[in-house]
Curated annotation (Swiss-Prot):
GO BP term, example: translation
Protein name: Small ribosomal subunit protein uS12
Chain's role: With S4 and S5 plays an important role in translational accuracy.
GO cellular component assignments: small ribosomal subunit
Stored PANTHER family: 30S RIBOSOMAL PROTEIN S12 FAMILY MEMBER (PTHR11652)
Protein backbone atom coordinates (compact mmCIF):
# COMPACT_ATOMS: atom_id res chain seq x y z
CA UNK A 1 0.00 0.00 0.00
CA UNK A 2 1.60 3.32 -1.05
CA UNK A 3 1.87 6.29 1.26
CA UNK A 4 0.10 9.54 0.42
CA UNK A 5 3.38 11.22 -0.54
CA UNK A 6 4.19 8.33 -2.89
CA UNK A 7 0.77 8.75 -4.53
CA UNK A 8 1.35 12.51 -4.86
CA UNK A 9 4.70 11.87 -6.55
CA UNK A 10 3.75 8.98 -8.87
CA UNK A 11 -0.03 8.62 -8.91
CA UNK A 12 -1.90 5.47 -9.81
CA UNK A 13 -1.38 3.77 -13.16
CA UNK A 14 -4.46 3.77 -15.38
CA UNK A 15 -5.74 0.38 -16.54
CA UNK A 16 -5.58 -0.01 -20.33
CA UNK A 17 -8.83 -1.47 -21.69
CA UNK A 18 -8.13 -3.75 -24.67
CA UNK A 19 -10.68 -3.47 -27.51
CA UNK A 20 -12.65 -6.40 -28.90
CA UNK A 21 -11.91 -5.59 -32.56
CA UNK A 22 -8.48 -3.92 -32.78
CA UNK A 23 -7.96 -4.43 -36.54
CA UNK A 24 -10.81 -2.01 -37.34
CA UNK A 25 -8.82 0.85 -35.73
CA UNK A 26 -11.99 2.56 -34.38
CA UNK A 27 -13.80 2.34 -37.75
CA UNK A 28 -17.31 0.84 -37.98
CA UNK A 29 -16.34 -1.27 -41.03
CA UNK A 30 -13.24 -1.93 -43.11
CA UNK A 31 -12.69 -3.15 -46.67
CA UNK A 32 -10.41 -6.04 -47.47
CA UNK A 33 -9.48 -8.77 -49.95
CA UNK A 34 -10.07 -12.47 -49.23
CA UNK A 35 -6.79 -14.38 -49.19
CA UNK A 36 -8.32 -17.76 -48.30
CA UNK A 37 -11.92 -19.04 -48.02
CA UNK A 38 -12.39 -22.28 -46.08
CA UNK A 39 -14.48 -24.13 -43.46
CA UNK A 40 -13.61 -24.79 -39.82
CA UNK A 41 -15.08 -26.93 -37.06
CA UNK A 42 -16.35 -25.18 -33.91
CA UNK A 43 -15.36 -25.67 -30.27
CA UNK A 44 -16.35 -28.69 -28.20
CA UNK A 45 -20.10 -29.11 -27.59
CA UNK A 46 -20.96 -27.90 -31.13
CA UNK A 47 -20.44 -29.65 -34.45
CA UNK A 48 -20.63 -28.06 -37.92
CA UNK A 49 -18.56 -26.75 -40.83
CA UNK A 50 -18.45 -22.99 -40.32
CA UNK A 51 -17.58 -20.87 -43.36
CA UNK A 52 -14.73 -18.43 -42.68
CA UNK A 53 -12.33 -16.30 -44.73
CA UNK A 54 -8.88 -14.83 -44.15
CA UNK A 55 -9.12 -11.16 -45.16
CA UNK A 56 -6.25 -8.70 -45.72
CA UNK A 57 -7.62 -5.28 -44.79
CA UNK A 58 -6.77 -1.93 -46.39
CA UNK A 59 -4.63 -1.08 -43.35
CA UNK A 60 -2.47 -4.18 -44.00
CA UNK A 61 -3.77 -6.31 -41.11
CA UNK A 62 -4.90 -9.87 -41.93
CA UNK A 63 -7.87 -11.19 -39.93
CA UNK A 64 -10.14 -14.24 -39.87
CA UNK A 65 -13.79 -13.32 -40.44
CA UNK A 66 -17.03 -15.30 -40.44
CA UNK A 67 -19.30 -15.57 -43.49
CA UNK A 68 -22.89 -15.48 -42.14
CA UNK A 69 -25.99 -16.94 -43.79
CA UNK A 70 -26.74 -19.97 -45.95
CA UNK A 71 -24.47 -20.22 -49.03
CA UNK A 72 -22.02 -17.62 -50.33
CA UNK A 73 -20.18 -16.63 -53.53
CA UNK A 74 -16.85 -15.62 -51.99
CA UNK A 75 -13.54 -16.90 -53.26
CA UNK A 76 -9.92 -15.79 -53.20
CA UNK A 77 -9.45 -12.13 -54.32
CA UNK A 78 -13.10 -11.24 -53.53
CA UNK A 79 -13.35 -7.70 -52.11
CA UNK A 80 -15.42 -7.71 -48.92
CA UNK A 81 -16.48 -5.39 -46.10
CA UNK A 82 -15.96 -6.58 -42.53
CA UNK A 83 -17.55 -5.44 -39.27
CA UNK A 84 -16.82 -6.31 -35.65
CA UNK A 85 -18.56 -9.15 -33.85
CA UNK A 86 -17.07 -12.42 -32.73
CA UNK A 87 -18.29 -15.99 -33.25
CA UNK A 88 -18.46 -17.62 -29.82
CA UNK A 89 -17.63 -21.18 -30.90
CA UNK A 90 -14.81 -20.31 -33.33
CA UNK A 91 -11.60 -19.30 -31.52
CA UNK A 92 -9.82 -16.36 -33.15
CA UNK A 93 -12.79 -15.27 -35.30
CA UNK A 94 -13.62 -11.72 -34.12
CA UNK A 95 -15.10 -10.22 -37.29
CA UNK A 96 -18.09 -10.76 -39.60
CA UNK A 97 -18.30 -10.20 -43.34
CA UNK A 98 -21.10 -7.79 -44.32
CA UNK A 99 -23.42 -9.56 -46.78
CA UNK A 100 -24.84 -7.62 -49.74
CA UNK A 101 -21.92 -5.16 -50.11
CA UNK A 102 -19.03 -5.13 -52.60
CA UNK A 103 -18.38 -8.68 -53.95
CA UNK A 104 -20.47 -10.48 -51.29
CA UNK A 105 -24.05 -11.10 -52.46
CA UNK A 106 -26.98 -11.23 -50.05
CA UNK A 107 -28.59 -14.47 -48.88
CA UNK A 108 -31.09 -15.71 -51.48
CA UNK A 109 -34.63 -16.49 -50.33
CA UNK A 110 -34.23 -14.80 -46.95
CA UNK A 111 -37.54 -13.48 -45.56
CA UNK A 112 -36.76 -12.54 -41.95
CA UNK A 113 -33.85 -10.43 -40.62
CA UNK A 114 -33.17 -9.44 -44.25
CA UNK A 115 -31.13 -6.33 -43.43
CA UNK A 116 -28.54 -8.42 -41.57
CA UNK A 117 -27.98 -10.65 -44.60
CA UNK A 118 -28.24 -8.13 -47.46
CA UNK A 119 -31.41 -9.66 -48.89
CA UNK A 120 -33.78 -7.56 -51.00
CA UNK A 121 -37.47 -7.30 -50.14
CA UNK A 122 -39.48 -10.16 -51.70
CA UNK A 123 -42.00 -8.83 -54.23
Amino acid sequence: MPTISQLVRKGREKLVVKGKSPALKESPQKRGVCTRVYTTTPKKPNSALRKVARVRLTNGIEVTSYIPGVGHNLQEHSVVMIRGGRVKDLPGVRYHIVRGTLDSVGVAGRKQSRSKYGAKRPS
